[in-house]
Amino acid sequence: MIHFTKMHGLGNDFMVVDGVTQNVFFSPEQIRRLANRNFGVGFDQLLLVEPPYDPDLDFHYRIFNADGSEVEQCGNGARCFARFVRNKGLTQKNKIRVSTSSGKMTLRLERDGSVVVNMGVPVTDPSNIPFKAKKVEKTYLLQTPVQTFLCGAISMGNPHCVIEVDDIDTVAVDEIGALLTRHERFSKGVNVGFMQIINPGHIKLRVYERGAGETLACGTGACAAAAIGQLQDKLSRQVRVDLPGGTLHIDWDGEGKPLWMTGPAEHVYDGQIQL
């Protein structure tokens, strides 16, 4: 039997598994079965806590999408990861350092229950997103058989494409998201954000996640939208991001500096399941 915890960050829901005290391995097929909301646990992503690969760090953080694919980063998951390792007694620290497949992160538990995450420095170099472009631009043209889109491209440890829209409620997120998430210029696929700017310190956002479809919230997507909006001179240093599942707060001092995300992490229930 595998012991797990169901958690969510603004409705972006996770199955979190302790791989420190349990010996666990998940095949892509098992993950897809567990992710099924009718026949399994049901989740957007599976988060696996592993012992650190580096003695200077506290844990290694792995993320699997509902389709079984392993991905580099998940911001909402990072907040739940921090809450999980404290709740389970895996650490007594309030400041937790973890590695992911794309780098290192610092997670900080606040007294009010929120979690602050140092998401690292946003990556704009196309070759490191990865995105096919000759040079860094504030906006890029993405051509599809249906229409051409104007977007920003950035990596927050995972690739993001952000499109500004006039009305977040009427945009065809599923159709456009499915069209762009596998666009040929993004060799590893891409998460697609749809951003409506309310004012320089406030945006509304919906995100079509690579391998998961539209979710109620996407932490790295919120970070990507805030960073791209600032790089395009449309947003301020501190941005409130309203997602369908709730609100995140993003702080960024600009290029070359780490970006900080603050938001909630909620425990839903503990369970066990036979693989």
UniProtKB/Swiss-Prot annotation:
Compartment(s) where it occurs, according to its Swiss-Prot or TrEMBL record: Cytoplasm
Positions marked as site (Could be important to modulate the pK values of the two catalytic cysteine residues): H160, E209
Pfam families in alphabetical order: DAP_epimerase
Gene3D superfamilies: Diaminopimelate Epimerase, Chain A, domain 1
Annotated positions for site Important for dimerization: Y269
Disulphide bridges, residue numbers: none
Entry keyword annotation includes Cell membrane: no
Pathway of action: Amino-acid biosynthesis; L-lysine biosynthesis via DAP pathway; DL-2,6-diaminopimelate from LL-2,6-diaminopimelate: step 1/1
E.C. code: 5.1.1.7
GO cellular component, as recorded: cytosol
InterPro entries hit by this protein: DAP_epimerase_AS, DAP_epimerase_DapF
One example GO MF annotation: diaminopimelate epimerase activity
Subunit-structure text: Homodimer.
Protein's name according to its UniProt entry: Diaminopimelate epimerase
Species this chain originates from: Shewanella denitrificans (strain OS217 / ATCC BAA-1090 / DSM 15013)
